[in-house]
Every structure is written in C-alpha cells, then in structure tokens.
C-alpha cells in the first residue's frame, strides 16, 4: 500500500462504536487511507459531524425520511459530499467505484445485503457484522470466493485466528482453534442472580467498549456462540475443531493449535482499533493508536471453561451449528428480537435464552440453498419470537 494512492474505504455503520474506531485509524494515515463513503441508520446529526471531519465523497442515511436533513445539512456546511438514502443506494455504493474496501459494521441482519453487494463486487471486506456470517455464511463465503473478494474479520477473536493462520501454510495442519471469551460482566453468577440483571448492568462490559446489542450478547455468551458459527464459515473448520475458553483479562484473543503440537496465540490490549488497523493495512502493519501490551503489569492470565448451565446461549449456538441449514439464521433472528425486548425493559435477562430456545425448537429448519430461503427463515423466526414475548412463562 505504501507509495500507492490511498485506499478508498466505505464505513457502513459509521456512527457506531466500530465505525468510529475505524475512522480513528483512517484519520491517522491520510496518505494511505481515505474515508470515501460514510453511512448511518438514523443519526443524521452525528453523520453530518463525521462528514465535516472526514469529508467523504458520499454519505448515506438508511432512514429515507431523513434524506432532506442530510442533503440540506451537507449544503449548509459547504461540503461537496453527495447525499444518499435507503437500502438500495447503500447496496449500490457498496459495489461502486466509490470504494475498494468496505467496513461492514451495520448491526444485525440489516447489514447483510450491503455486505453481499460488496462481496459480489470483489471488495476487500472488513467484516464486523457477524450476523452476515451467521445468517448466510455459506452464501457469503461462496460469493466472495467467486468474485475474488477478500474477507478480513474484525472481531478480535477471528482477527487473532486470521493472523495466526497467515503465519504458515495452515491448509492441513490445524488441529483446533480456541476462541477466548471475557465471560462478560456476570461471569460466576448463578441463574438466581442473573434473573435480577438490568439492561444498564448488561451493557457495561468489563473490558470492551461496544454498542448495546453486542454488549448484551457478550453478557449472555451468545456473542461467543455466534463467533463459533462465524469461525466455521471463515476458516472452513467443522464445529468439532472449534473450542471456547473463558479468559477474563481479554488479552489472549484466540489460539490456533497445530498438528505438530505448536500453539500460536495473538495477544493485545482490548481495543478494536488494533483489528481494524490489521484489516485496513494487511499485509502491512500500521500504527493504530493502541499501546503495547505490558505483561509484567498485567501479572497473570486466567482461563476457565464456560458455564453453559448459567449461560445457555452458547449451547444453543452449538446446537444451531450442528443442525445446519437455516438453524443459525433462526438462532440469530430470535436473539435479535429477544435482546431488543430486554433492552426495552419488556423481558428479563433469562428470557433471552428462553425465547431463543423456544423459537429454535418450534421452527423447522430447512436447507439454506438461497438468500430468499434464509430471509424467509429470519422473518418466520422473528414472528414466532415476537408472539412468544406475550407468553408470561418465558419472561424469566
């Protein structure tokens, strides 16, 4: 990348925690990187502020009713940035010459169409939208391979595995990969204690600065379950070769064990700017704004098995991976509805796995042979979960 024109980066989900971290890294390297496209869901004022700072060629607001506010706000600031709105325009930008790299950081299944559009267009895809892989992993990886798109994961765990696997020809030599989990803010609590957890407590992650949905997923261990499914698709590994360990310090991000007995691990401070810098500059390394890891000051590294009795979402994700087909899409959709209800105070913390399990067992799985099939399963799962929300027995 050195000596060439700057990489043109589209940041989808620019106002979220991952989007702002990506823009922080991009701004540190104006000779190498340029934020050429920025998108947001409905936070038009925040998007306008980012446009004033980064001056992209294009800005998009997903909520089309806010298009006039975006257009007029850009004009009022004297910016030449072109305004866009809606899902179709987002997909068009993802596949256009406006970018060669896409940071896919839109939360939830809403991020899937633009992620697929970027893959079809052969872009470098920095994948922070884990739902795209969980919902349509086979389709996404197949599409990327056919178009020559490069998928670089941004999750710290998958970035760690990516970096370890790129250290050698690992096509046949991997015995297993080990994803680490912080354990979330409620590690060590039993189900009785978890019943009283509030949304404010659940979004206060002990190590990472994240958005509310992914913070709750971390607290339930669903985040780790989704990452198991992601790892299966990203690295072509069967579920039997993917393990999980709880590591409360969040310094060892993942490990790869090889058949010769060697184990490689990637360590670093818990800051998403590190993995974003890896994805933006790979195979080069650039400064990310994150300091080095001082193991002496950290003192110790602890590991323990996950408690799937207290946190059954991890078990449910394993079940969905084993079932295959549309089961992961059903899992993901049910979880999105359940987490949203919890964050709105409609249900308790323990209702999240109860709702997900109810939907997984109620809805029959099918072969995931097309995007339409997957989206239909997603819609059905949401309907079943929303109906179950009215059932008091699930409101744990």
Curated annotation (Swiss-Prot):
EC number: 1.1.1.267
Record-level Gene Ontology MF annotations: 1-deoxy-D-xylulose-5-phosphate reductoisomerase activity; manganese ion binding; NADPH binding
Full protein name: 1-deoxy-D-xylulose 5-phosphate reductoisomerase
Cofactor(s), names only, from the UniProt record: Mg(2+); Mn(2+)
UniProt keyword annotations, A-Z: Isoprene biosynthesis, Manganese, Metal-binding, NADP, Oxidoreductase
Pathway, per record: Isoprenoid biosynthesis; isopentenyl diphosphate biosynthesis via DXP pathway; isopentenyl diphosphate from 1-deoxy-D-xylulose 5-phosphate: step 1/6
Binding-site residues, 1-deoxy-D-xylulose 5-phosphate: 130, 156-157, 182, 205, 218, 223-224, 227
Family: Belongs to the DXR family.
Positions of Mn(2+) binding: 155, 157, 227
EC class name: oxidoreductase
Pfam family, one: DXPR_C
Gene encoding the protein: dxr
Gene3D superfamilies associated with the record: 1.10.1740.10, NAD(P)-binding Rossmann-like Domain
HAMAP family per the UniProt record, alphabetical: DXP_reductoisom (MF_00183)
Annotated function: Catalyzes the NADPH-dependent rearrangement and reduction of 1-deoxy-D-xylulose-5-phosphate (DXP) to 2-C-methyl-D-erythritol 4-phosphate (MEP).
Catalytic activity: 2-C-methyl-D-erythritol 4-phosphate + NADP(+) = 1-deoxy-D-xylulose 5-phosphate + NADPH + H(+)
Biological process according to GO: isopentenyl diphosphate biosynthetic process, methylerythritol 4-phosphate pathway involved in terpenoid biosynthetic process
Source species: Xanthomonas axonopodis pv. citri (strain 306)
Residues binding NADPH: 15-18, 41, 129, 131, 211
